[in-house]
From Swiss-Prot:
Disulfide bonds: none annotated. Gene3D superfamilies: Ribosomal protein L22/L17 (3.90.470.10). One of its GO terms (cellular component) is cytosolic large ribosomal subunit. The gene is rplV. This is Large ribosomal subunit protein uL22. The lineage of its organism: Bacteria, Bacillati, Bacillota, Clostridia, Eubacteriales. It comes from the Bacteria. This protein binds specifically to 23S rRNA; its binding is stimulated by other ribosomal proteins, e.g. L4, L17, and L20. It is important during the early stages of 50S assembly. It makes multiple contacts with different domains of the 23S rRNA in the assembled 50S subunit and ribosome.
Length: 140
């Protein structure tokens, strides 16, 4: 059975994708509660943007798919590059340099943790037979 997922996307965020990826890498695979705690104490501007997207993904999971928010974890999260605004910086002797102000598209996908399968119970007869077989091989 495939796990249900919910996603949220923030487009045209005015932060370089390279800087956002540093924050995204911290929360990938973590539970939602852990991810929020990590983002709260990450002293980077983009942490607030990522937290906003994560909060939206959790709200989507709860509202659209009726998932239990306590069981959610960050299944995947990634950052794509958006368009760049080009600005000019004047240089010496009439020249100009182009400054690219980059944008990011942040995507966060949350899913419910898969239920742990019931632990397979060992057959007591098989375990006893194996113990007897091992006991016969040891001679002092």
């Amino acid at each position: 059975m495939e796990a249900k997922t919910a996603q949220a996307v923030a487009k045209y965020v005015r932060t370089s994708p390279r800087k956002v990826r540093q924050v995204i890498d911290l929360i990938r695979g973590k539970s939602v509660a852990d991810a929020f705690a990590i983002l709260k104490f990450t002293p980077v501007k983009s942490a607030a943007d990522v937290a906003k997207v994560l909060k939206s993904a959790v709200a989507n999971a709860e509202h659209n798919y009726e998932m239990n928010t306590a069981d959610l974890y960050v299944q995947t999260c990634f950052v794509d590059q958006g368009p760049s605004m080009k600005r000019i910086s004047p240089r010496a002797q009439g020249r100009a340099d182009v400054i690219k102000k980059r944008m990011s598209h942040i995507t966060v996908i949350v899913a419910e943790k898969p239920a742990k399968p019931a632990a397979a119970k060992k057959d007591p007869k098989a375990a006893a037979a194996k113990a007897d077989a091992n006991a016969g091989t040891k001679e002092g």
